[in-house]
Swiss-Prot record:
Gene3D superfamilies: 2.40.240.100, HUPs, Ribosomal Protein L25, Chain P. It holds the Pfam family tRNA-synt_1c_C2. This is Glutamate--tRNA ligase. It catalyses: tRNA(Glu) + L-glutamate + ATP = L-glutamyl-tRNA(Glu) + AMP + diphosphate. Its EC number is 6.1.1.17. GO terms for biological process: amide biosynthetic process; glutamyl-tRNA aminoacylation.
Length: 561
């Protein structure tokens, strides 16, 4: 097992050195290995010395030696540098990152990850790989009302699918005693107090910039109330711990915000507790204790950054370097976790991977590769300007990846069965991939009846059947009469006859192509049944992932043109 890890560390150190034409960093190499081989995450802390050894070996090699050694040991990694990475945008430098970074991705386990999560997770991962260091997956599960027990596993699965180089996994619900301790310390500093005011009364005072009576309690009185909270002597809504801020702050939401509260129901799925921190308190404590150096997140968190700075200032902690990127509008899919859950429960959606949703598992089911998502998010970058997510760019990025791999097949939607009058028996030999003859060909035999796509022949007087011959079409109302019109491709071009796909009527499989705007029913080549869980190209239609081929029926999900 150690030999496997050492080999992986060495080849990825080589790849990093060739890519950047400089000596690699241990943290970057470790992040890459853990992102591509999550089975080693449980041993993340053991990798430092092994990575150091690999980096030292590579550092002594010349640029030419590095490249030739990489080509000998892992030619596919060298190919990645020329095929894909040369097209990936380089993001701006991070201040103070020269000696490595510690960054975090902090989802709430309310459901699976979606495109919004993907942006945050990928941008942070990008910089950890670039500068080296640690990448913490921090599951922020301190609000029982927003925790879905099934989401814990879904988040880990989605993180693995995205290939994030996670080095540490932290569950905030495991750290409640830590938050309790720091809350007590904050009270002792005079930076927080226990408030038993009615919430509406407190709101009225806050809007007027006035202190509530609880703000004047002594440290001893506050500590006694805090202990009563922990002992279960209060109930939900009775009490909260507030951080002392500026009652004259121009933004009322900044004035004495809540840090701790009681939640009696629902019960937390992982811990037996009723006192939980609110996000800004637990995040500030964790960012300090976990050594987070840089935080990249949306500008909708700018106010939270200001709240968290109060905690850092009270304790004299150095805050991370913050970068806030602009909002990303995403059209065409559902992203609201509550909306998705309601739709699933009502039967509107088939599950979290329904193609109308913006979850990672829905994206994956359509045949979008994780590297395409990564590249698309890096293309968007960390700018502060609000933008709209470009599906076309994601599809373009995915096409770069799947086009060289996807075998070609015919799919005939809404078929019309015809007999071509005067046609000879003919075998069509169509390449599985036009740029890779070694894959071989598909053989389609045209004799007697064939299937043609209705939409492609309606109103046409002549078409060319791809890899076969030309046919003329005469119409008797809605009924086509089809006759053989020779083999000449030049004649078809001269007549501007469209080239369409077709199938033998006696060699086909029923196929459903599921799309966001409605399904297509038709038939595909029998060989498609062997492509389950792979992306193929249905010629003239687009790329699709073959989801299943059970009971003689193919189910496919449309990816893009």
């Amino acid at each position: 097992m150690d030999g496997d890890i050492e080999h992986l560390l060495f080849i990825y150190a080589l790849q990093n050195a060739v890519k950047h034409d400089s000596a690699p960093k241990s943290g970057t190499v470790i992040g890459t290995v853990l992102g591509k081989h999550p089975e080693f995450r449980s041993r993340a802390r053991e990798l430092g010395p092994l990575a150091g050894k690999a980096v030292a070996q590579v550092g002594k090699m010349s640029a030419a030696d590095r490249k030739s050694r990489l080509e000998a040991l892992a030619p596919e990694l060298l190919a990645e540098l020329t095929e894909t990475h040369e097209h990936v945008r380089k993001l701006p430098d991070l201040e103070g990152a020269e000696n490595g970074v510690v960054m975090r991705f902090a989802p709430n386990p309310s459901g699976p990850l979606h495109l919004g999560h993907a942006r945050a997770s990928i941008l942070n991962d990008y910089y950890v790989r670039r500068y080296g260091g640690r990448y913490v997956l921090r599951v922020e599960d301190t609000d029982p009302k927003r925790v879905d027990p099934d989401a814990y596993a879904m988040v880990l699965e989605d993180v693995e699918w995205l290939g994030l180089g996670i080095t540490d996994i932290v569950y905030q619900s495991d750290r409640l005693d830590i938050y309790y301790d720091w809350c007590r310390k904050l009270i002792e500093l005079g930076g927080a107090y226990v408030c038993v005011c009615d919430s509406e009364r407190f709101r009225e005072l806050k809007l007027k910039g006035k202190a509530c009576p609880c703000r004047e309690l002594t440290v001893e009185e506050n500590l006694e109330l805090w202990q009563q909270m922990l002992d279960g002597e209060f109930y939900e809504g009775d009490v909260t711990v507030r951080v002392k801020t500026d009652l004259a702050h121009p933004d009322p939401a900044m004035r004495d915000y809540s840090a701790m509260r009681i939640v009696n129901a629902p019960l937390h799925p992982r811990v037996d507790a009723t006192v939980f921190p609110l996000m800004n308190f637990s995040v500030a404590v964790d960012d300090h204790l976990l050594g987070i150096t840089h935080v990249i997140r949306g500008k909708d968190h700018i106010a939270n950054t200001r709240r968290q700075r109060y905690i850092f200032d009270y304790f004299g902690w150095k805050p991370p370097v913050y970068r806030h990127y602009g909002r990303m509008g995403i059209s065409g899919v559902v992203l609201s976790t509550s909306g998705m859950r309601e739709g699933i429960n009502s039967g509107l959606y088939t599950g979290w991977d329904d193609i109308h949703l913006g979850t990672m598992r829905a994206i994956a089911r359509r045949g979008i590769e994780p590297e395409a998502v990564r590249n698309a998010m890096v293309d968007i970058g960390i700018g502060e300007t609000d933008i709209s997510f470009s599906w076309e760019n994601l599809y373009s990025r995915n096409k770069e990846l799947v086009d060289p791999k996807a075998n070609r097949y015919f799919f005939v939607p809404d078929p019309v069965e015809v007999t071509v009058e005067g046609a000879p028996r003919r075998e069509a030999h169509a390449a599985l991939h036009p740029n890779d003859p070694s894959r071989g060909v598909r053989t389609l035999v045209a004799e007697e009846a064939i299937l043609l796509p209705r939409a492609d022949i309606e109103g046409k007087s002549m078409v060319r059947l791809k890899d076969l011959y030309n046919v003329k079409i005469a119409w008797d109302g809605d009924t086509p009469r089809v006759s053989y019109a020779g083999d000449s491709l030049e004649e078809a071009r001269h007549e501007k006859a469209p080239i369409i796909q077709w199938l033998p009527a006696d060699a086909k499989l029923p196929c459903t192509l599921l799309r966001q705007d409605g399904s297509l029913e038709g038939f595909c080549e029998p060989l498609v049944a062997g492509e389950t869980d792979r992306v193929v190209q249905f010629e003239r239609i687009g790329f699709a992932r073959i989801d299943s081929a059970d009971g003689g029926r193919v189910s496919a999900y449309f990816a893009h043109r």
